[in-house]
């Protein structure tokens, strides 16, 4: 049976994530309440294990030293209704879940590089504000994480290289938590 930790008790699981994980700042942005998600635990009043499922691409984080059988059972139950992308830290939970509960998604990305004609431009670097946000090509990913433009502008930030009124490049610091910031730069190339 899945036990969902009430949002107001999320502080009870922060101590269960001491070992640094891949995408750690995304996890801590959730634990600090900046982005939405759900936490499943072994005990509502005194959790010793947790699985956090973020709304952001359903990224899923497993707490340090969680019992592998509990993790497997929890993930299998969640997967009955949700697609998960589990971020696995072998230093936090050394044993991987048994084969068969995961769905392997084969992926092969091939990007053929062509010479890009470059030209000198004069661009201004502008902080993303409410007006500039509306013009950004990648704003939907920020809305996926923060649900509203206002939440993004309050809890994260970004910059654009702008020539006239045209955005040449977008740069987002979407997740700034646990003393680290995830920074992504998107260019036309």
What is the predicted role of each segment?
Residues 1-24, 109-151:
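Short amphipathic alpha-helix that is part of the acyltransferase structural core
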Residues 29-32, 149-153:
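Short loop/turn motifs at secondary-structure junctions and domain boundaries
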Residues 7, 31, 74-78:
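An N-terminal domain-start capping segment
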Residues 35, 46-47, 156, 168:
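Short beta-strand-initiation
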Residues 9-10, 53-57, 175-176:
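A short, sequence-level motif marking secondary-structure junctions
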Residues 25, 36-133:
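Acyl-donor-binding surface of acyltransferase catalytic domains
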Residues 150-188:
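A conserved beta-strand-loop-helix scaffold within acyl/acetyltransferase catalytic domains
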Residues 52, 79, 136, 160, ...:
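Generic recognition of cysteine residues
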């Amino acid at each position: 049976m899945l036990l969902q930790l009430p949002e107001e008790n999320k502080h009870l699981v922060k101590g269960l994530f001491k070992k640094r994980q891949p995408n750690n700042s995304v996890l801590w942005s959730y634990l600090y309440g900046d982005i939405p998600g759900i936490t499943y635990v072994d005990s509502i009043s005194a959790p010793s294990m947790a699985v956090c499922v973020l709304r952001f691409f359903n990224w899923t984080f497993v707490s340090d030293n969680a019992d592998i059988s509990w993790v497997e059972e929890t993930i299998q139950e969640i997967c009955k209704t949700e697609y998960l992308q589990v971020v696995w830290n072998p230093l936090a939970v050394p044993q991987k879940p048994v084969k068969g509960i995961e769905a392997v998604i084969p992926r092969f990305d091939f990007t053929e590089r062509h010479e890009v004609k470059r030209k000198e431009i004069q661009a201004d670097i502008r902080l993303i504000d409410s007006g500039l946000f509306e013009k950004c090509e990648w704003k939907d990913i920020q809305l996926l994480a923060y649900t509203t433009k206002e939440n993004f502008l309050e809890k994260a930030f970004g910059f654009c290289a702008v020539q006239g009124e045209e955005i040449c490049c977008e740069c987002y610091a979407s997740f700034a938590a646990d003393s680290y910031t995830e920074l992504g730069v998107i260019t036309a190339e």
